[in-house]
Amino acid sequence: MANDPRNFPQRKLLVTCALPYANGSIHLGHMLEHIQADIWVRYQRLRGNIVNFICADDAHGTPIMLKAQQMGMSPEEMIAAVSIEHQKDFAGFDISFDNYHSTHSDENRELASHIYLQLKKNGFISSRTISQLFDPEKEMFLPDRFVKGTCPKCKSEDQYGDNCDACGETYSPTELINPKSAVSGATPVMKDSEHFFFDLPQFESMLKEWTRSGSLQTETANKMQEWFESGLQQWDISRDAPYFGFEIPGEKDKFFYVWLDAPIGYMGSFKNLCDKRDDLDFDEYWNKDSKTELYHFIGKDIVYFHSLFWPAMLDGSGFRKPNNVFVHGYVTVNGAKMSKSKGTFVKASTYLEHLDPECLRYYYAAKLNSRIDDLDLNLEDFTQRVNADVVNKIVNLASRNAGFIAKRFEGKLAENFVEPELYNEFVAAADRIAELYEAREFGRAIREITALADKANQYVDEKAPWVVAKQEGKDQELQEICSVGINLFRVLMTYLKPVMPALAARTEAFLNEELTWEGVAQPLTAHEITAFKALFNRIDPKNIEAMIEASKEDAAAEMAAKEKAEASNAAQETELSKDPIAEEIEFDDFAKVDLRIAKIVSCESVPKADKLLKFQLDIGGEMRQVFSGIKAAYNPEDLVGKYTVVVANLKPRKMKFGMSEGMILAAGPGGKDLWILEPHEGAQPGMRVM
């Protein structure tokens, strides 16, 4: 067995998944990446390598701040609840993280500040005043993701303000065509603000060398070359208050842009792990001259940040760069984008309520490769492939032989192994399967394994132990045939252990033997196994249908909760909250104001005045002329004969159109939304308002 791990030096690896954003649930799109990374990590551990597998919630930014407000809680409360939910989902899919943390942590604050200050010290940070989009209704600067419009590069509509999902380009939100605030829908206005920039162009030579190292995926390297040719730009790393995140050291009301401290979250999570253990050294893994290996698994939508900004930030602040960034595509369901209305936008928790997580792990593995290809979760194919491969070909191999071993031979395998050539063929496949796992060609590895399963079942079919069992004097032959079948099953499950850890654990209990990569070199002989129990259940199409219906219900409940929160927030935004009560005054101050009932004798528009109406008011034996800016709210003729309230002792004011001898009282924010005060029936002109 040439690829025996005992023949190679032990590797030390730090592996990460992209940090899920802490404002929503994990769904099957997220799970592609986490399953892909977990399979690779489990394979490395199976080969005897030391792996630290870490992740965290990406917990900063305006979206989190606004959603927390919508939910009526603090951002800290919301991200704490989301973290619990995320970790439960990942555990449900057997994602074997060594540590799961949050970017909103002391470790991350310290590391983000340290990296920023080092970059500043080394001359890679500058500041300048920029014109930035500002929401005039919400009175806030708009983060990139809260401006939507048409991409300036490819002209795709409904794109975010920082990068285009259609063409992958990044740009400034001010470059968007027809921008709109995603918060209020208002057209943003430009407003000046001082911002801080990371000088990415200074790292172009280093990044080109890193790209040419040959370790990056071809598609990633080609995309980076396009970015080099179009020219690297300085990167805006700051955001203005209000913002949920870390304040920039030494600056007031300036915060780190979420994409600065998010990847530093990899370091923060590992630092948190190091602080909890005494066998890990943070510097050993992150020093510039580190001999350990660092790998990031990410989706294709965040390549720009991980292949340009992140290695440049690390290099500029004295840390090591990643060995590689493994990029995957998106998940579609039944050939289309995941849809909430169709029930194909499936949350991880909803899946776990209806189906075995190992089914999805196997199916994703069977379709994954090392390229940046989208993966389609075809639910019909999903059912057929899992049932055919896992149940019919692999698990059935054990059930076809285990019964005879248990009933006829007290659970003991044969002392002699009678098919060494066949077994050696299975063992020889280990090197090829190992290469495919290492290269993340999981689909090809699965095809190698299922091809071996076909050979194992062919052997059992040809030997027909159910026929031999009925023949006199054939007990030894029966035991030997079934022992071969059990041993071939053992090899197959060893190869599948990174993909299906729970099934592998049940197999180990059945075989009474740990499955190890080097262990397959020799078959089990004269070995006692336990009584066979069902190891794996078929997928029932009814469960998939139930999952789809539950996903539709999830979407409806989510929409109802959102509408309820919005209604609650709208109710909370009272007139009083929008226009707070003025400072207290003494009673004597109020007593100076003489309010009287007035009858509107006449009312007419003022020529060449957009807002004014001219009133003649009877205030009880005395006529007053008053001008009032309520023209947008009333037709003059509709007011004649009505009673209202007027400030009678207001000093007369000379206006362009005449003398105004008082003030009519009206309520409202202005414009069309104004209502004059009217007394109840019985009030007479000249009466004092007490």
From Swiss-Prot:
Gene Ontology molecular functions: ATP binding; metal ion binding; methionine-tRNA ligase activity; tRNA binding
Required cofactor(s): Zn(2+)
EC number from the UniProt entry: 6.1.1.10
Chain ranges for the short sequence motif 'KMSKS' region as given in the UniProt record: 337-341
UniProt: ATP binding residues: K340
Catalytic activity: tRNA(Met) + L-methionine + ATP = L-methionyl-tRNA(Met) + AMP + diphosphate
GO BP terms in the entry: methionyl-tRNA aminoacylation
Cofactor, how bound (note): Binds 1 zinc ion per subunit.
Enzyme class: ligase
GO cellular component: a single term: cytosol
Keyword line: Aminoacyl-tRNA synthetase, ATP-binding, Cytoplasm, Ligase, Metal-binding, Nucleotide-binding, Protein biosynthesis, RNA-binding, tRNA-binding, Zinc
Subcellular localization, as worded in the UniProt entry: Cytoplasm
tRNA-binding domain mapped to chain residues: 589-690
Pfam family, one: tRNA-synt_1g
Binding site residues for Zn(2+): C151, C154, C164, C167
Motif ('HIGH' region) on chain: 20-30
Assembly and binders: Homodimer.
Stated role: Is required not only for elongation of protein synthesis but also for the initiation of all mRNA translation through initiator tRNA(fMet) aminoacylation.
Alphabetized NCBIfam families for the sequence: metG (TIGR00398), metG_C_term (TIGR00399), PRK00133.1 (NF001100)
Similarity comment: Belongs to the class-I aminoacyl-tRNA synthetase family. MetG type 1 subfamily.
Name the record gives this protein: Methionine--tRNA ligase
